[in-house]
Amino acid sequence: MSKELELQLQEALRRIERLEAAQACRNLMGKYSYYHTAFRNKEYVELWANRDDCYYRFPFGEYRGIEAIRHCYLVEHGDRTDPGMDQRLKGMLMMHEMDTEVLEVAEDGQTAKGCWISPGHETVPAKDLKDGEEPHGDANWCWGKYEVEFIKDNGQWKIWHMILYPLFKTSFY
């Protein structure tokens, strides 16, 4: 094989690796959206790199390090399999789709950055309904922008840093 052909082959392989990396990052965000909607927070936490320099920043706080992120989702929010959660989640639906993606993988193939617009809605049932009271609750449009950095962690793509910027939240009605 000629030197020129060998260089072209190496470049093609690097490009394929970066394309595969981009798809892996897209899949992480798809899983994030799905797990969030399904309240599958135990699985959601597995999407994160097992690192002390991870962070998750959103309107309700900032969590630094994988242990803090685990605490956010497994203690503060809980998981659908937790005792009593089936009753707490009854009538609740939070769906945040990922849209308008911009995603770039670094030349070295070890990190990537992306952002997504997230058109979402959140429906929360009213608490403490009185006997005979018609079920009701809050339904809101809740749009945001996700800024996410990914890192290859032990050979697997994982979420490294995530920031959620709220764009607007308003009543569905």
Describe the role of every protein-language-model region.
Residues 1-34, 38-42, 46-47:
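Short, low-complexity N-terminal intrinsically disordered segments enriched in polar/charged residues
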Residues 20, 61-64, 138:
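A structural signal for alpha-helical segments
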Residues 23, 93-94, 139-141:
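Transmembrane beta-barrel outer-membrane domains
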Residues 28-31, 43, 99, 145-149:
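Short, hydrophobic/aromatic alpha-helical segments in well-folded domains
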Residues 41-123:
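A solvent-exposed, acidic/Ser-Thr-rich amphipathic alpha-helical stretch
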Residues 111-115, 136, 141-173:
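Short beta-strand edge/turn micro-motifs at domain boundaries
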Residues 123-128, 169-173:
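A short, polar/proline- and glycine-enriched secondary-structure boundary/capping micro-motif
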Residues 126-136:
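Short, surface-exposed loop/helix-turn segments at secondary-structure junctions
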